[in-house]
Amino acid sequence: MKFYSTVAVLCIAGSNLFAQDVYQLFKAEGFTQENLFTNNIEGPCFDRYGNLYVVNYQKDGTIGYVKPNGDVSLFLTLPEGSTANSIQFNSKREMLLADFTGHNILKVNMKSRKVSVFSHDAFNQPNDFCINSKDQLFVSDPNWKDNTGKLWRVDKRGKAKLLDGAMGTTNGIELSPDEKILYVNESVQRKVWAFDVDDRGNVSNKRLFTEFADYGLDGMKCDRDGNLYIARYDKGVIAVFSPDGKLIREIALNGKKCSNLVFGGLNGKLVFVTLQDKKGMERFRNDIPGKNW
């Protein structure tokens, strides 16, 4: 999903959100107020028009719309029994949600706001996902009780295929800018794995990308150069790794329980982070734009 001229117009209009040059490089600051979301705040995602959506606003089972000045309003309440943990948009501009309590991938019509089940398979707890240019989803599916997890691919028709059924607690997941490498982390095991991805979305050559001795791992995103940004849960930093697995820097946040992140702003150089201890969001200016810019 690339961002086009329409987004640029909207970005300029929302100066509080997009005037990124006023922010000190790598210096985190508050974006939304605290305690607007639940402690399950997660899954920040921009649509192609520059609108920001985040899960679990005010109560679990909701989607919040975050305005350019950091104010938040209710966009959608999900059907009873559903709680989203991640958001993506497909090429049809439909919102897709990882529903970890309903064990589904949900689809939202953005005009009618009608919610339907897009995929329902043997999911334990779909947690996070990323999407490629063919509208294929790659989904992490952890079992926190057993410290195990699975990796799925869901095609554009909603058909799921198990790619790896013998992983640790799968959580954060991201594709490289060229969509040839898939990164999947395991929160409890504190490992990040890399897979090669072929043109059909099959994975191979699983290898250890990096691992940590402490704290947790959560959401991940790539910048345009292929560097990987990892939310270090409980440590309160975003760890940035080069494509060859070398630590470039750690960006300190004010909150500790960082759950996910997304690139945004006029040039894609603002990074917005969800924090579960703050029940809100922070942001910082980056030197490289996100992979969609």
Model-predicted segments: where are they?
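Blade/loop signatures of beta-propeller domains
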Residues: Q20-E29, Y57, D141, K150, ...
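Beta-rich, blade/repeat-based domains predominating
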Residues: N35-N51, P79-D99, N104, D121-K150, ...
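Glycine/small-residue-rich hydrophobic helix-like segments
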Residues: V197-N260
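Bacterial Sec-dependent N-terminal signal peptides
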Residues: M1-V22
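Beta-propeller fold detector
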Residues: S73-T77, S116-H120, K161-G165, S204-T210, ...
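Short loop/turn segments that connect beta-strands within beta-propeller blades
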Residues: V66-D71, N109-R113, V154-G158, D196-G201, ...
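A short loop-to-beta-strand structural motif that recurs across blades of beta-propeller domains
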Residues: T62-G64, N104-L106, K150-W152, K191-W193, ...
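A short helix->beta-strand "capping" segment at the edge of beta-propeller domains
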Residues: Q20-T38, G70, K206-R207
